[in-house]
């Protein structure tokens, strides 16, 4: 089992798909990585040689920010917005949608489950 960027890649999948198990690598990025490493995307991940695995590791380490580094950068960006006190930062702080969606109705994913209010009942 190949281990790249601290993630065990699944054995039975094509390497193009297996690379997407790494946080920060999607299908297009996986294709670019394999192109730079001169590896066919249809190769199963357990059929890779040690040389090929090392070349993939080298490409990822030198060109891409993945896993812990990327998670840290994203959380630091959000923290920076919150510290600035800008509109987006306030929305993050309050747990509301950040990108202009309506909140009068909907936005339940971001706001969480409904809180019931006493006295708001249909009259019989």
From Swiss-Prot:
It comes from the Bacteria. Keywords: Ribonucleoprotein, Ribosomal protein, RNA-binding, rRNA-binding, tRNA-binding. GO terms for cellular component: cytosol; small ribosomal subunit. GO terms for biological process: translation. The keyword Protein biosynthesis does not apply. Residues 95-124 are annotated as: Disordered. GO terms for molecular function: rRNA binding; structural constituent of ribosome; tRNA binding. InterPro entries: Rbsml_uS13_C, Ribosomal_uS13, Ribosomal_uS13-like_H2TH, Ribosomal_uS13_bac-type, Ribosomal_uS13_CS. The keyword Ribosomal protein applies. Part of the 30S ribosomal subunit. Forms a loose heterodimer with protein S19. Forms two bridges to the 50S subunit in the 70S ribosome. HAMAP family: Ribosomal_uS13. Located at the top of the head of the 30S subunit, it contacts several helices of the 16S rRNA. In the 70S ribosome it contacts the 23S rRNA (bridge B1a) and protein L5 of the 50S subunit (bridge B1b), connecting the 2 subunits; these bridges are implicated in subunit movement. Contacts the tRNAs in the A and P-sites. Belongs to the universal ribosomal protein uS13 family. PANTHER family: 30S RIBOSOMAL PROTEIN S13/40S RIBOSOMAL PROTEIN S18 (PTHR10871), SMALL RIBOSOMAL SUBUNIT PROTEIN US13M (PTHR10871:SF1). This is Small ribosomal subunit protein uS13. It comes from Syntrophobacter fumaroxidans (strain DSM 10017 / MPOB).
